[in-house]
Amino acid sequence: IGQAQALRERLAALPLTAVVTSPLDRTVQTTRLMLGDRDVPVHLDERVGECRYGDWTGRPLKELAKDPLWRVVQAHPSSVVFPGADGESMPQMQHRAVSAIREWNDRLGPDAIYAVVSHGDIIKSVLADALGMHLDQFQRLHVDPCSVSVVQYTSMRPFVERTNDVGGDLSRLAPSPKKKSRRRTSDAVVGGGAGA
């Protein structure tokens, strides 16, 4: 609860257009605590819901770590299909989550600032996609509860602006007043700076 309330303070400077959240109770609760009394539309979207772990759902991590599939999940997640009728593959999980976020980005528009409240594997898989990493490398990413990761999507490519930020100032993410600018032929700045 304290983490979500701290996140509320950090997000206060951002004009959120919407919040898209996994429908699981814990993410809905985090969303409510994160927003407090802000009047921001909240959208439940199963596509950013937890990985469908099938028969693994609800089992303790100590027990799962002894399952031979655990090593595969850690080393080669792209080949994992979770057992059971409702288990999914990790590539399916990544595809549905990335597709959902890209669809929300298109729906809300290029200037929208919105939050997606989701789960560790979902967030890591979206970050891996945005970084151009193979899914087998996504376990190299770390995502803490109530951390902030920021991906800016442009017509050419995504830009990863932050990962696993647990205390930094987020005010820089707020849009600055529009300035008259030259038309750029690319969305990336030579030299990696903010450009002129």
Describe each region flagged by the PLM:
Residues 51-62, 106, 110-112, 129-196:
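Acidic, low-complexity terminal tails and accessory targeting/binding regions
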Residues 1-39, 44, 67:
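Active-site-proximal alpha-helix that buttresses catalytic centers in soluble enzyme cores
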Residues 5-12, 94, 98-106, 127:
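Generic structural signal for well-ordered alpha-helical scaffold segments
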Residues 36-99, 152, 162-163, 174-178, ...:
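Phosphate-handling substructures
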Residues 33, 125, 129:
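Active-site signature of alpha/beta-hydrolase-fold catalytic machinery across serine-
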Residues 21-22, 95, 117-118:
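Short beta-strand scaffold positions
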Residues 112-121:
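Generic beta-sheet signal
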